[in-house]
Amino acid sequence: SVQDERTHILTALEEAQERADIVLITGGLGPTKDDITKKTIAEFFQDDKIIDYPEVTNFIKQMFKKYNIPFNKVQQYQSQLPSKATLLMNRLGTAPGMWFYENDTVFVAMPGIPYEMKGLMTYHVLPRIREKFHLPFIIHKTIMTYGQGESLIAERIADWADKLPSFIK
């Protein structure tokens, strides 16, 4: 956890870049004065150029219209991202995610609202990470049993389990 303070964020980003292949950042992407993460990330990447994404603006306008909320300049800020960022469209809220790649490190900035972050992770971040790092697709299955203890079941399937490939656990 890092304070919403410019120097703390910059230091954390520098340290993370030295140690990690993937850095996940949550929160601070909103339109209020205390949401400084987007601005600080742009500074970290030495990126003064801002790109306005009309698709984000249109999405926010549609969302606000649905709830009869006026669209204003503060909201327009949500659709402006640093030029080095790849837009990760957030269909569950107003703050889009951002994907950066620099010096062999991926940085992903996502909104701090848990369900919005989960949506971005599921539909944008994890698929990109799998592709970028050539990760295998993992299938997880749970087998429910009853009436017999774990040790008895383990004994019954031991021969079969021993023949499974090493990548199956």
Residue spans of the language-model regions?
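Short, contiguous clusters of charged residues that form electrostatic/catalytic patches at enzyme active sites
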Residues: T7-E14, S79, Y123, E155
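Short, basic, helix/turn surface patches
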Residues: I22-G28, Q78, P82-S83
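An accessory alpha-helical subdomain
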Residues: E102-K169
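Glycine-rich beta-strand-to-loop/alpha-helix junction loops that act as flexible
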Residues: I25-K33, P111
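Helix-rich terminal scaffold detector
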Residues: V2, A12-E15, R19, I25-T26
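Short beta->alpha junction loops
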Residues: S1-T7
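Proline/glycine-rich low-complexity loops and linkers
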Residues: D35-K132
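Glycine-rich loop at the start of a catalytic domain that most often binds anionic cofactors/ligands
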Residues: H8-E18, I36-E43
